[in-house]
A protein has these predicted regions:
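Conserved ABC ATPase signature
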Residues: 48-55, 228-266, 277-287
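Pre-Walker A-like glycine/lysine-rich segment at the N-terminus of P-loop NTPase domains
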Residues: 2-67
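Hydrophobic positions in the central parallel beta-sheet of the AAA+
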Residues: 6, 273-277
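Electropositive, glycine-dotted interaction segments
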Residues: 112-224
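C-terminal lobe/lid and adjacent interdomain/linker elements of RecA-like ASCE P-loop ATPase modules
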Residues: 1-2, 291-383
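Short acidic, glycine-rich loop/turn motifs
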Residues: 8, 97-103, 131-134, 233-238, ...
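Extended helical coiled-coil dimerization/tether regions that scaffold
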Residues: 9, 184-250, 369-383
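Conserved P-loop NTP-binding catalytic core
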Residues: 44-50, 54, 64-115
Length: 383
């Protein structure tokens, strides 16, 4: 299963409907094909999707919507999904997830969700209604109509009388079983500010050597229900730990996050799934970040169409992209918006980092007035 597009209406934090495309919007040249994933014929998907914006612009919120939509089509109960918080207390949120399945069909799943407060004061979410549309991709005349289901009747609609289905689980579960299809999701959203290495049976030595060449050995061992961590630096004695949190005393945050991230990268490239990373530059130097992005943009390495979806503050990272349509500019001006860069910047030959930092794209640099107020406040406190 490959996600083509996600739209969302009725979200409390958003200024207008959210609309994110994962397939190419601009014309695909021969030289572009090396950094894209070929879906079929002339349809290509972005292997690395960037969401960039200043602090508090809403980048994490956009990532949460994507995570929620992915988990819905994966049959996860909404109330068990961490990203459900993006729904807030909304009474009517409509999420449409467009995807391409194993049968070579383009499908549209529309899920309408409502919040209700429980006795404990927490919101509990349930699906009010659901519909599924589908069409063979062979019947699509051009890219313009790839996700257009205008005038078509749904092939299936949710029947809430079905006792076997929990009211927060999508009825897409039946479609996925029939088509023997699913979507693999790997998320680093919960690791943005927390760096504790989870138990893993296999940490590739190549990953460790890339991140910290002084480490000779790092592995987990389980004996009689207890977990031990073996850590050895070159020319040093082996250290044995029984708590992963203690690794922070010996390894940098970047190394720990790197091991978690690159271990997931290996899984995503193998499965053709999705990796969600918030603040990709957090704890990493620029070279590690660009390496990560380039792995996904290498069509010879990324044969199965693994997709990296990330947020960043790094304008320089935009220059890794030859195209504009794999980048979204996130702004928060009385509500969050996410706009595809190809709609704002028509030419690919303009240096993207310069356009971003110059303020040419609007809402991408901190307001000058806020800067002056901060400067005056600091000056007053020093005197």
């Amino acid at each position: 299963m490959k996600i083509l597009r996600i739209t969302a209406q009725g979200l409390p934090l958003f200024k207008k409907d959210l609309d994110i495309c994962f397939y190419t919007q601009q014309r695909v040249c021969e030289e572009d094909k090396d950094s894209l994933y070929r879906l079929t014929d002339n349809y290509y998907l972005h292997a690395a999707c960037a969401f960039i914006g200043i602090n508090a612009s809403g980048k994490t919120s956009v990532l949460k919507v994507i995570s929620l939509a992915l988990n819905i089509v994966k049959n996860e109960p909404i109330n068990h999904v961490e990203a459900k918080s993006i729904l807030g207390g909304a009474k009517n949120v409509t999420i449409r997830t467009y995807f391409y399945d194993k049968r070579s069909y383009v499908c549209c799943l529309e899920t309408v969700i409502a919040a209700k407060k429980s006795k404990t004061g927490e919101y509990v979410y349930s699906i009010l209604s659901e519909s599924l549309w589908e069409k063979p991709i062979a019947t699509v005349k051009s890219k313009k109509y790839l996700t257009d289901f205008t005038g078509m009747k749904p092939v299936e609609q949710r029947n809430n009388d079905e006792a076997y289905l929990s009211d927060d689980v999508s009825f897409i579960i039946a479609h996925n079983k029939k088509a023997n299809d699913t979507v693999e999701i790997f998320s680093l959203l919960s690791y943005t500010n927390v760096n504790v290495l989870p138990f893993t049976e296999d940490i590739p030595l190549e990953v460790i050597a890339f991140l910290d060449p002084t480490i000779e050995k790092l592995c987990f061992e389980q004996t009689e229900g207890k977990t031990f961590i073996h850590l050895k630096f070159k020319d040093e004695k082996e250290i044995i730990l029984n708590n992963a949190a203690d690794l922070e005393q010996y390894l940098s945050s970047g190394t720990i996050k790197g091991i978690i991230t690159f271990s997931m990268v290996k899984e995503v490239l193998h499965s053709g799934g999705y990796l969600l990373v918030d603040e990709i530059e957090n704890h990493f130097n620029k070279e590690i970040v660009t390496t990560l992005v380039r792995f996904f943009m290498d069509s010879r390495l990324n044969k199965n169409g693994g997709t990296l979806i990330f947020t960043t503050h790094y304008p320089e990272l935009l220059d890794e992209y030859d195209r504009n349509d794999g980048i979204c500019i996130v702004r928060n001006r009385n509500g969050i918006t996410a706009e595809n860069l190809s709609y704002i910047l028509k030419r690919n030959d303009i240096k993207k980092s310069d356009a971003y930092q110059s303020g040419f794209l609007e809402g991408t640099t901190p307001a000058y007035e806020a800067y002056m107020r901060l400067k005056k406040s600091l000056a007053a406190s020093i005197n």
